Amino acid sequence: TFSGLSKSHMIAGFRIGWMILSGAKERAKGYIEGIKMLSSMRLCSNVPAQAIVQTALGGYQSVAEYVKPGGRVYEQRECIYNALKDIPGISVVKPHAAFYIFPKLDVEKFNITDDEQFALDFLHEKQVLLVPGKGFNWGAPDHFRVVYLPNVLQLEKAIGKLKDFLAAYKQK
């Protein structure tokens, strides 16, 4: 069994996870030894984050208040979705089970042939980082990803900068 706290407890980025092996461990002895060797050579434990595991697993387990209307994550998602759908040249689907949104750009309107260049142009001009779709194995240069965990004011500011940027953007 594999599990983690990143999504269930809204601490994305901390990469706190675990693996539980049950049953006849003798059959998995080589696998277990390989995991032990790999973890002792290549992995560095996130000691500060490990301190929250016991509290997280032993405490209140619901995120319902965050994802219902009025909740922080709900309001952040609504903010980013509504702001993006109102920008000419962007189409977007509202996410239902993620902390990010994956908008589509009208590549003809903006003359986009390289989504990485688009992200770099936006970063250089407006100092806001977007992740190009190719970073998630998206084949066409027409998507980018935005995590909507920052507070609503930060999201509004960033999307305002994107709207201003796209008003005059044509990729060279």
Language-model-derived ranges and their functions:
Residues 54, 70-84, 92-106, 140:
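Conserved glycine-rich beta-strand-loop-beta hairpin in the small C-terminal domain of fold type I
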